[in-house]
């Protein structure tokens, strides 16, 4: 099919995801109209009208493709011909093992690449409503600062009750870093919920002295100040930061998320805990657990320090630390299909942070997939998602259905997530040392990461070599 006979795909939003999606489409011979509202309408966080402007950090995080999940994502994106990674590499600044960029040079490079592409038209205009029906193939990549008018239009189309709010993020811990000689599995009152066993939570007990010390640590910890535009956004219902609850009274937590009722510590069954911190399974693979009720605005270093004082979490490895900030994202597992299309209106795809991924690289990766899916659809080709064993596939699985929704967490338990090895399907066999013996501790963790990374990159290369993906 000649490219001149193809109708354009419309991409709404010129951030990391939208820019990557537009490039992937154009590189596959599909004309693109990229709609970016800046400078016609600005946001509280952007300072330029450049495409792919980095509004916070200039770091794309670790570039280690052997033992770090985001480094694996970098490597996969490079193999897939990512514009964002190409421009990041070209504008790299020294940052140790991380990939950091000159933010202005990076944005200028992305803008130039798209402006100069013969199949890309950039329109500087705000899209304030669901695109018209004649736009039969659309990618909405409007990010965490989606304009109010478009956000309201999406709400009305999906029937969701909330789209923009203060996003409460609880810390997530790798299961294999929790000390189960101190913690234990049990649901409150041994209650068996849907799909549960009555032992669905991990419980970490605190005696009175430990509880008082924990409250003191929360109150004394250093917090992240809210930016001006965030201060105007109300808290999401039921998502007060844990340190704010502690400020309301020293016993507040013990009668709230840390209540000890209905639980018996099998390691010390004759002593009732003064308080109990619970962790709930966070992914279907059962490799990640989140700290229930622990949304927080403590600085990341403080979170690690304070949370590792909890019995059983002394050596906790965090897949994600907690946070509280203004965000706009969909309840994607319920609303999107496996190729990021809106179930209620399949001509619309979503990409980037609005889908519930977290981070620059993750946003661009979802844009890359959305662009490839939209191109395949426009060209009449099969839509083949990347394998779940790849970083891209693991991220896609989380967004479109990998997150557990629990009854007690309410109707909106899906939360944004950075890519991490806890999202990957686990290995069939445990890693072994050169002597054939099973590895333990940190050696096992490192070997496991290496094997997951090797598998991901191998499977990504195989996927890219398939006719549908390579087209």
Swiss-Prot record:
FAD binds at residues 13-18. Its EC number is 2.1.1.74. GO terms for cellular component: cytosol. The keyword Mitochondrion does not apply. One of its GO terms (molecular function) is flavin adenine dinucleotide binding. It catalyses: uridine(54) in tRNA + (6R)-5,10-methylene-5,6,7,8-tetrahydrofolate + NADH + H(+) = 5-methyluridine(54) in tRNA + (6S)-5,6,7,8-tetrahydrofolate + NAD(+); uridine(54) in tRNA + (6R)-5,10-methylene-5,6,7,8-tetrahydrofolate + NADPH + H(+) = 5-methyluridine(54) in tRNA + (6S)-5,6,7,8-tetrahydrofolate + NADP(+). Its cofactor is FAD. Its main location: cytoplasm. GO terms for biological process: tRNA methylation; tRNA wobble uridine modification. Keywords: Cytoplasm, FAD, Flavoprotein, Methyltransferase, NAD, NADP, Transferase, tRNA processing. Gene3D superfamilies: FAD/NAD(P)-binding domain (3.50.50.60). InterPro entries: FAD/NAD-bd_sf, MnmG-rel, MnmG-rel_CS, MnmG_N, TrmFO. It is an enzyme of class 2 (transferase). It is found in: Cytoplasm. The keyword Flavoprotein applies. Catalyzes the folate-dependent formation of 5-methyl-uridine at position 54 (M-5-U54) in all tRNAs. Belongs to the MnmG family. TrmFO subfamily. HAMAP family: TrmFO. This is Methylenetetrahydrofolate--tRNA-(uracil-5-)-methyltransferase TrmFO. It comes from Azorhizobium caulinodans (strain ATCC 43989 / DSM 5975 / JCM 20966 / LMG 6465 / NBRC 14845 / NCIMB 13405 / ORS 571). The lineage of its organism: Bacteria, Pseudomonadati, Pseudomonadota, Alphaproteobacteria, Hyphomicrobiales.
